[in-house]
Regions:
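Extended substrate/RNA-proximal surfaces in nucleic-acid metabolism proteins
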Residues: 51-206
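An N-terminally biased module of ancient metal coordination in phosphate/nucleic-acid-related enzymes
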Residues: 1-72, 155-159, 170-252
Length: 252
């Protein structure tokens, strides 16, 4: 079996490549399959599938849902999603509206301190794009407020920063069950990024399995061999499908 990438983002969320550019890059890299998993949306899937139609690559429709966990969120990737599924579309619109409300308030807070961030700039000419904190980071760099993305997140976009506005998440159960209802395969994304102890991770997976979780990312761009070995054993323990991806965002 050839190389696949089951976790990528496009300009329909916080990536810098359009869906068609993503397909072209995947083909040029010799990938056998690629999944588009934009945050909380499937709006880029039609362009993605069309771009791959005559290419020697399998294009997998997907998404990455942010679901509530403690005082933050965790991410559930959904692969092989029916992007036309009515229930999924409704839930996606609810999530996007919540994001928009949060983003508008964050932009207003920046403007009050004479940092002229607007929603028009954040969407960058693509009104269907799901705006994330990465979009804010780009503009903070553009306006010379910070030098790089890490500085933007540490000083201005972290939950402890005065510009940060929390948003309301859907529940873990709702996210997983909606992916399943749309014919998708729900997978816990980048489990080590949540900084949980082994006991906490196992407790979370026990709960998510009850809701229908089917897989976990055992390969990820920042994982060491030791990390991968650890998560692969966790996957076996919980009888979860091993998945993996780069979490490619283009130049972000």
């Amino acid at each position: 079996m050839g190389t696949v990438d089951l976790h990528t983002h496009s300009t329909f969320s916080d990536g810098t490549c359009s869906p068609s550019e993503l397909v072209n890059k995947a083909v040029s890299c010799g990938l056998q399959a690629i999944a588009l998993t934009d945050h909380d949306t499937v709006e880029g899937i039609p362009d993605f599938l069309e771009a791959a139609k005559d290419m020697a690559i399998e294009a997998i429709p997907g998404t990455e849902l942010s679901v509530g966990f403690r005082d933050r969120d965790i991410h559930i990737v959904g692969l092989f999603i029916d992007h036309t599924h009515e229930g999924f579309q409704k839930m996606s619109q609810i999530m996007i509206k919540r994001r928009d409300a949060r983003n508008e308030e964050m932009a207003a807070r920046f403007r009050r301190d004479n940092i002229p961030i607007t929603m028009e700039e954040l969407t960058n000419g693509n009104p269907d794009a799901v705006v994330t904190r990465a979009h804010f980071a780009r503009l903070l760099i553009k306006y010379g407020v910070v030098k790089n993305t890490a500085e933007a997140f540490d000083g201005y976009l972290d939950p402890s920063a005065p510009y940060y506005v929390p948003r309301e998440y859907i529940s873990r159960e709702e996210g997983i069950k909606t992916i399943l209802a749309a014919g998708g395969v729900p997978i816990l994304a980048h489990p080590l990024l949540y900084h949980l102890s082994e006991k906490e991770l196992c407790s979370l997976l026990t709960e998510l399995k009850e809701y229908g979780l089917l897989g976990i990312e055992v390969k990820y761009s920042t994982y060491s061999k030791q990390d991968e070995y650890f998560i692969r054993n966790i996957a076996k323990k919980f009888d979860l499908l091993p998945s993996g991806g780069s979490d490619f965002h283009g130049t972000n």
